[in-house]
């Protein structure tokens, strides 16, 4: 065996140390960059929550305006959610289990509200349901007005939130093995029984995820609502619009209402994470 000289051993050790330094540098850079972004994301929310627990902010939640906005948000989002479930469930099943001409186009239409700016969505709804819109004019002739009413709030929420429900439930339906449904039919179950006994239990976590995501999106809707429904206290001023209105006259109320939405968003996030990890 040929031994190495002390000089070569020193050079080898120095080279190994340099390699370790090179390997150690990228993780340090990654951690530093990540820390900057995480701080940027967490700091505003933390300051908001700290400000929200101040006595003046807490007291503002008892104001009639705050209670009215909260009530309107809950009522409209629950109605919107019911509409989304009734219309979105068969649509999600259709997209997940059937191949047909035009399926890609239908899929793209479902995704469109996600990428469409909310203000643009409001303008589009206005062109359809406004007093001189495609459907709004004949409705107005029949004595029915949609724009700047609570119904307009619901329509705006349904428009922007539907894709979140359909997308989540589509994934759940697609994950159901067809063999299980076929076995249920072979055992004597009809289509409805197979759907209720096999498909629904397997897709249920995706259903919960879709409901939570759609409800959270509807609850936070602002742009389409203010364009299409306006900001009328007691009629169309939901929580996001009440926050915007309060910024001009009562910062404490805006902070408190913002904290309420933040808390709801946090709960919704935890529910989605729990369901997605299979711990429901």
Regions inferred by a protein language model and the residue ranges of each:
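The alpha-helix within a helix-turn-helix
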Residues: 184
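Glycine/proline-centered hinge or cleavage motifs at structural transition points of membrane proteins
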Residues: 187-189, 201
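Membrane-water interface segments at the C-terminal ends of transmembrane alpha-helices
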Residues: 21-55, 64-174, 198, 202-223, ...
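Short hydrophobic, aromatic-rich alpha-helical segments embedded in or entering the lipid bilayer
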Residues: 232-246
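Short, glycine/charged-rich beta-strand-loop motifs at protein surfaces that mediate ligand recognition
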Residues: 213, 227-231
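Short coil/turn motifs that cap or connect alpha-helices
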Residues: 101, 179, 189-191
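Short, Lys/Arg-rich, polar N-terminal cytosolic tail immediately upstream
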Residues: 1-24
């Amino acid at each position: 065996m040929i031994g190495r000289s002390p000089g070569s051993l020193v050079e080898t050790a120095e080279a190994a140390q340099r390699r370790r330094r090179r390997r150690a540098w990228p993780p340090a850079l990654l951690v530093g960059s990540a820390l900057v972004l995480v701080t940027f994301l967490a700091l505003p929310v933390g300051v908001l929550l700290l400000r929200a627990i101040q006595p003046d902010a807490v007291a503002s939640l008892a104001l009639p305006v705050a209670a009215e906005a909260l009530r309107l948000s809950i009522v409209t989002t629950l109605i919107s959610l019911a509409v989304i479930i009734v219309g979105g469930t068969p649509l999600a099943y259709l997209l997940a289990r059937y191949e047909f001409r035009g399926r890609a186009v239908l899929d793209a239409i479902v995704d469109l509200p996600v990428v469409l700016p909310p203000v643009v969505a409001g303008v589009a709804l206005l062109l359809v349901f406004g007093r001189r819109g495609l459907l709004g004019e004949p409705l107005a002739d029949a004595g029915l007005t949609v724009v700047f009413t609570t119904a307009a709030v619901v329509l705006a929420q349904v428009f922007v939130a539907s894709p979140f429900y359909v997308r989540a439930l589509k994934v759940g339906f697609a994950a159901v093995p067809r063999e299980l449904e076929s076995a249920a039919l072979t055992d004597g179950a009809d289509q409805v029984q197979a759907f209720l006994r096999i498909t629904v239990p397997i897709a249920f976590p995706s259903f919960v995820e879709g409901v939570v995501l759609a409800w959270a999106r509807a609850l936070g809707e602002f742009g389409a609502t203010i364009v299409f429904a306006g900001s009328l206290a007691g009629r169309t001023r939901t929580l996001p619009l009440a926050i915007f209105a309060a910024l001009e006259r009562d910062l404490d109320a805006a902070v408190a209402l913002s904290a309420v939405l933040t808390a709801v968003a946090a709960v919704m996030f935890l529910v989605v994470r729990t369901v997605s990890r299979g711990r429901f």
